[in-house]
């Protein structure tokens, strides 16, 4: 059965999701997009991307639609998600990627409009279930979970990074720093922002700011709830981020044992979600990598009970591929 998808919000993540679905999945069909932008602009930004390059098929704007190759995708422009005709369009799953409707009560409006499930492409509040694939997706219950959060890109990287290490040697406590690409929540030039650090020009500064990944990890790995803390450093790159996790372990270990644990995970149960590399990478090397976490073996350190591990991630493309994987998982039980 082909699962019919609607995308609410056609910004960076919405367009990346569209590209990922087109590149990977014959099981999913994007049938409609809702965004307040004008159709010619939306079509142009899908066709030409500063990071991903040109779309591999011809993209043209039509009245109320975008034509991609031989497919026509309906375009809606509705502010109220409850007014969207998902049922009339036969949409099974809505990917909520506006960044606005992250509260489950608001996201549930998509269900009122006829969708069967909603995936929030962000950390959420009041959701039925928060999932990180490879970590807790086995707990998904289609009978109980309708509004599902895919957590954040950082939580997807940290979740895999932490679970492999916790399963191998046990994590007692730890600190995480994500060195993260700038996002649209920041300013191109100095301008007012509720976070005074984010008020500063994104392309000119290293910007310390908060990260909810450590708190969110408790939702997907309850045994680590309250054991990790975190913050972020936003840096002047458009995509390509890295998680630096330093923990106190419950037993002694070695660099070799830690690396072996990640190598086994990457070639086994985490294949496709976790990649293992020995090469000396920089951030542009992982742009376009679909993995949740690219483990950088050469940066592994052990000092007494402390272990440092580092995982790269394309915060747009990797995360969007997880959204496609999650939609496929949910769709398999509709």
Curated annotation (Swiss-Prot):
Q: Which GO terms describe its cellular component?
A: cytoplasm
Is NAD among this UniProt entry's keywords? yes
Explain what switches its activity on or off, per the activity regulation comment. Answer: Inhibited by pentalenolactone (PL).
Site feature location: Activates thiol group during catalysis:
180
Which range is the signal sequence, renumbered to this chain?
A: none
Q: Which SMART domains match?
A: Gp_dh_N (SM00846)
Q: What is this protein called?
A: Glyceraldehyde-3-phosphate dehydrogenase 2
Organism equals: Streptomyces arenae
């Amino acid at each position: 059965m082909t699962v019919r998808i609607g995308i609410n919000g056609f910004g960076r993540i919405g367009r990346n999701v569209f590209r990922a679905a087109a590149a990977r999945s014959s099981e999913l069909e994007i049938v409609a997009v809702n965004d307040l932008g004008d159709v010619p602009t939306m079509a142009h930004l899908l066709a030409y991307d500063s990071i991903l390059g040109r779309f591999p098929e011809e993209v043209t704007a039509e009245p109320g639609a975008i034509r991609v190759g031989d497919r026509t995708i309906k375009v809606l422009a509705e502010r109220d998600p409850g007014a969207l005709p998902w049922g009339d369009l036969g949409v099974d799953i809505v990917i909520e990627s506006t960044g606005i409707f992250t509260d489950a009560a608001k996201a549930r409006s998509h269900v009122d409009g006829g969708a069967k499930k909603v995936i929030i492409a962000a950390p959420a509040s009041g959701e039925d279930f928060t999932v990180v694939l490879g970590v807790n997706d086995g707990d998904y219950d289609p009978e109980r979970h309708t509004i599902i959060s895919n957590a954040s890109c950082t939580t997807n990287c940290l979740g895999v990074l932490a679970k492999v290490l916790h399963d191998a040697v046990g994590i007692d406590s730890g600190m995480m720093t994500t060195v993260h690409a700038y996002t649209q929540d920041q300013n191109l030039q100095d301008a007012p922002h509720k976070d005074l650090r984010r008020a500063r020009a994104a392309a000119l500064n290293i910007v310390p700011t908060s990260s909810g990944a450590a708190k969110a990890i408790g939702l997907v790995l309850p045994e680590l709830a309250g054991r990790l803390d975190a913050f972020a450093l936003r840096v002047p790159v458009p995509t390509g981020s890295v998680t630096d996790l330093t923990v106190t372990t419950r037993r002694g270990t070695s660099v070799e044992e830690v690396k072996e644990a990640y190598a086994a995970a990457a070639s086994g149960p985490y294949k496709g979600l976790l990649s293992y590399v020995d090469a000396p990478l920089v951030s542009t090397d992982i742009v376009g990598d679909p993995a949740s976490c690219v483990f950088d073996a050469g940066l592994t350190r052990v000092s007494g009970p402390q272990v440092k591990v580092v995982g790269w991630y394309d915060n747009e493309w990797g995360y969007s591929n997880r959204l496609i994987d999650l939609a496929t998982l949910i769709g398999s039980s509709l």
